[in-house]
C-alpha cells in the first residue's frame, strides 16, 4: 500500500449515486472530498472570470495548476458546497454556458494533464474520497479501496426524474432515459479514460439498494482493509 494518505475512489456512470455516497462517506470519516466531474466546470468558470480565452491552452494550463477549490461534504439530504477562491459557486457552475465551456477545456490535452496533477494534490491526511469516472483507473491507481457504483439505466433515469420534479422542472422520464443511455455510450466508448471499473474495484449495483446499504457495504470493505 502507498505510504501516502489513503484514497477511496468511487467511480460510476451518471445517476449511480456516487456523488451522494462520496459526500456522506467523507463527512462520516472526516476525510477530504474530491468531485472530479466539477473541476472542468470550475476551470471554465474561473477562466471566464479572469478573461482567459477557452482556447488558450497555456493560460488554461496555468489556471488549472493553481485552481483554488474546496469541496465541502453536505449534511444528508443537502447538496455539497463547492468553494472557488473563497466564493460558493455550487449553483453557478451548473449552467449550460459553463457546461459548454467545460467541454471545450476538457478537449485540450495539456489542460487534462494539469487537472490530473491538481486532482492528485487533493490527497492529504487523514484521507480522500474521490468521486468521478476514472479515479480508480487513471488518477489514483494505487488507491487501497476502489468502488465502481452502478445502477440500471432505468433506475438512474427514475432518480434523476424525481430529483428534477422536486425542483419543479417539467421533464420527461423517457427523454431522461434516452439521455442517460447516450451519455453511457459516450463515456464507455471515448478514447481517453473510458468509463470502466478498475480491475481491482469492488463493483456495487445500487439498483435495489438504499444509500445506507451501499454505505454499509463500503464500511465493511474499509474494515477488511484496516482503513477504519
Curated annotation (Swiss-Prot):
It is an enzyme of class 2 (transferase). GO terms for molecular function: ATP binding; CMP kinase activity; dCMP kinase activity. It catalyses: CMP + ATP = CDP + ADP; dCMP + ATP = dCDP + ADP. This is Cytidylate kinase. Belongs to the cytidylate kinase family. Type 1 subfamily. InterPro entries: Cytidylate_kin, Cytidylate_kinase_dom, P-loop_NTPase. It comes from Pseudomonas entomophila (strain L48). One of its GO terms (biological process) is nucleobase-containing small molecule interconversion. HAMAP family: Cytidyl_kinase_type1 (MF_00238). Pfam families: Cytidylate_kin. Keywords: ATP-binding, Cytoplasm, Kinase, Nucleotide-binding, Transferase. Its main location: cytoplasm. ATP binds at residues 12-20. Its EC number is 2.7.4.25. CDD domains: CMPK.
